[in-house]
UniProtKB/Swiss-Prot annotation:
MF terms (GO), sorted A to Z: amyloid-beta binding; protein-folding chaperone binding; unfolded protein binding
UniProtKB keywords: Acetylation, Chaperone, Cytoplasm, Mitochondrion, Nucleus, Phosphoprotein
Protein source organism: Homo sapiens (Human)
Subunit relationships: Heterohexamer of two PFD-alpha type and four PFD-beta type subunits. Interacts with URI1; the interaction is phosphorylation-dependent and occurs in a growth-dependent manner.
Function: Binds specifically to cytosolic chaperonin (c-CPN) and transfers target proteins to it. Binds to nascent polypeptide chain and promotes folding in an environment in which there are many competing pathways for nonnative proteins.
Name the record gives this protein: Prefoldin subunit 4
Gene name, Swiss-Prot/TrEMBL: PFDN4
Chief location of this protein within or outside the cell: nucleus
Domain of life, source organism: Eukaryota
Listed InterPro entries: PFD_beta-like, PFDN4, Prefoldin
One GO cellular component, as annotated: cytosol
Length: 134
């Protein structure tokens, strides 16, 4: 019985204010990564839609066909070539946004890895920092 009391006392770890701040930072960054990954998926779908639109315009036979292009809440008709250029520019901008978001995810993952090392070093098996797969 004395051995189990000593084991329980050894596992009782004091959580300091700094430790709590690290745990909170880990939770905030984990939540932020989830949001960023969802945003990346939305932007990738938008990029795919733009690529599909480019492909459809290329397949159009009529070069003098006016193609409506949405700007804000209105559609403005442009020539096939102008619309193609606008779509290419939109694709380029969207890809840059995706790259920036992925870069932010990578930097947050580095912070999380560092925090995970620090927190596991102090708390060991008394803390679970692994994401739920549900």
């Amino acid at each position: 019985m004395a051995a189990t009391m000593k084991k329980a006392a050894a596992e009782d770890v004091n959580v300091t204010f700094e430790d709590q701040q690290k745990i909170n930072k880990f939770a905030r960054n984990t939540s932020r990564i989830t949001e960023l990954k969802e945003e990346i998926e939305v932007k990738k779908k938008q990029l795919q839609n733009l690529e599909d639109a480019c492909d459809d315009i290329m397949l159009a036979d009529d070069d003098c066909l006016m193609i409506p292009y949405q700007i804000g809440d209105v559609f403005i008709s442009h020539s096939q070539e102008e619309t193609q250029e606008m779509l290419e520019e939109a694709k380029k901008n969207l890809q840059e946004e995706i790259d920036a978001l992925e870069s932010r995810v990578e930097s947050i993952q580095r912070v999380l890895a560092d925090l995970k090392v620090q927190l596991y070093a102090k708390f060991g098996s008394n803390i679970n920092l692994e994401a739920d797969e549900s």
